[in-house]
């Protein structure tokens, strides 16, 4: 039994027993089929979230309260830091949308007819290769220690890499199942709750590669928002 199977054996066994996934692309945004779900291939971007705001008129909590948070010897509010300008300055519209709390992430997904994944769904997509004929070096049915494969190489962590902050969608190395940034770049909200908190997955650019592993458990207040937290959506295969 592998290290990851000891952490979530029911997920690993179910996936390994019934691999039948292939790639399926949606018009907007790009999606990949992993098992019974279509996954956003990347984290939701500023441009994608902007379409939701334009359609719904949503004003986020960070915008109402004067800006999001960054950790510098403690949580510091940064005036003007919102999903529009994650670091308070104009950015490319293909960087992850951050400074969004759990409800805002879920609302965006629901607007698209999708939802946030569960932690178990997220782990199976991030660590178990389910493509029928994956490109090298990935191997079908292999359980990996990192979403990038055998090593964290190619992810956007605090270790040396080309990206000092969040990387644009698709800029890092594609990982297990062809998904981008399931490890690092920004934390991702999932549905799992612990009281008033919700779980986040995968680590971020602020942390080292150890936060990318499956055994990391990180909960945050559902109302919290910061420069390190984004999300992606899933929906059933039609």
Named regions from a protein language model:
Residues 2-85, 102-103, 130-132, 228-238:
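Short, compositionally biased
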Residues 223-225:
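A generic structural micro-feature
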Residues 59, 66, 70-71, 77-218, ...:
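Functional-site microenvironments in short loops/helix caps that host divalent-cation chemistry
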């Amino acid at each position: 039994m592998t290290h990851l199977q000891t952490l979530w054996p029911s997920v690993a066994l179910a996936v390994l027993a019934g691999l039948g996934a292939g790639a399926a692309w949606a018009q907007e945004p790009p999606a990949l089929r992993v098992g019974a779900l279509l996954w956003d291939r990347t984290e939701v971007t500023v441009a994608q979230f902007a379409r939701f705001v334009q359609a719904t008129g949503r004003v986020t909590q960070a915008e109402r309260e004067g800006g999001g948070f960054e950790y510098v010897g403690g949580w510091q509010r940064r005036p003007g830091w919102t999903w529009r300008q994650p670091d308070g300055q104009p950015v490319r519209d293909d960087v992850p949308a951050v400074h969004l709390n759990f409800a805002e992430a879920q609302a965006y997904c629901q607007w698209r007819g999708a939802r946030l994944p569960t932690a178990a769904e997220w782990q199976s997509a991030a660590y178990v290769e389910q493509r029928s004929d994956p490109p090298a070096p990935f191997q079908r049915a292999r359980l990996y220690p990192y979403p990038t494969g055998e090593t964290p190489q190619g992810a956007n962590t605090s270790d040396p890499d080309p990206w000092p902050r969040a990387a644009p969608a698709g800029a890092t190395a594609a990982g297990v199942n062809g998904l981008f940034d399931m490890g690092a770049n920004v934390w991702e909200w999932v549905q799992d709750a612990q009281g008033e908190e919700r779980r986040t997955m995968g680590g971020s650019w602020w942390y080292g590669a150890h936060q990318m592993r499956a055994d990391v458990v990180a909960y945050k207040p559902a109302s919290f928002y910061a420069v390190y937290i984004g999300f992606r959506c899933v929906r059933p295969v039609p």
